[in-house]
């Protein structure tokens, strides 16, 4: 898998933005990706050094439209800790 297939989008929330100040970034990633693949993809895409990764599988929410019930897709979130003094400039402007 290439890093374009692994990294899907940054997580956009107040909690994620406050963590960016401490060098911790959150991304939605491919559910099939492993921690080592995620680490390599982030280091290759952004040119930073990753020192820790936590991952979690987030189940899709049930949604209802009228009398029909559906479910959103399950997703995987990766919380990435960067080396001291490093940041991802592409996401720094959003915080």
Swiss-Prot record:
| InterPro entries (alphabetical) | Nucleotide-bd_a/b_plait_sf (IPR012677), Ribosomal_uL23-like (IPR013025), Ribosomal_uL23/eL15/eS24_sf (IPR012678), Ribosomal_uL23_CS (IPR001014)
PROSITE patterns noted in UniProt: RIBOSOMAL_L23
Q: What's one Pfam family the UniProt record gives for this protein?
A: Ribosomal_L23
User: Which domain of life does the UniProt lineage start with?
Assistant: Bacteria
Provide the family line: Belongs to the universal ribosomal protein uL23 family.
The record's subunit annotation is: Part of the 50S ribosomal subunit. Contacts protein L29 and trigger factor when it is bound to the ribosome.
Briefly state the protein's biological role. One of the early assembly protein it binds 23S rRNA. One of the proteins that surrounds the polypeptide exit tunnel on the outside of the subunit. Forms the main docking site for trigger factor binding to the ribosome.
Protein name (Swiss-Prot/TrEMBL): Large ribosomal subunit protein uL23
Name of the gene this protein is made from: rplW
């Amino acid at each position: 898998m290439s890093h374009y297939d692994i990294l899907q989008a940054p997580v956009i929330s107040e909690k994620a933005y406050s963590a960016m100040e401490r060098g911790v970034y959150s991304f939605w990633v491919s559910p099939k990706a492993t921690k080592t693949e995620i680490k390599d993809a982030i280091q290759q895409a952004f040119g930073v050094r990753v020192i820790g990764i936590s991952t979690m599988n987030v189940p899709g929410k049930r949604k209802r439209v009228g009398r029909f019930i559906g479910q959103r897709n399950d997703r995987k979130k990766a919380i990435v800790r960067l080396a001291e003094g490093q940041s991802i400039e592409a996401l720094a402007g959003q915080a």
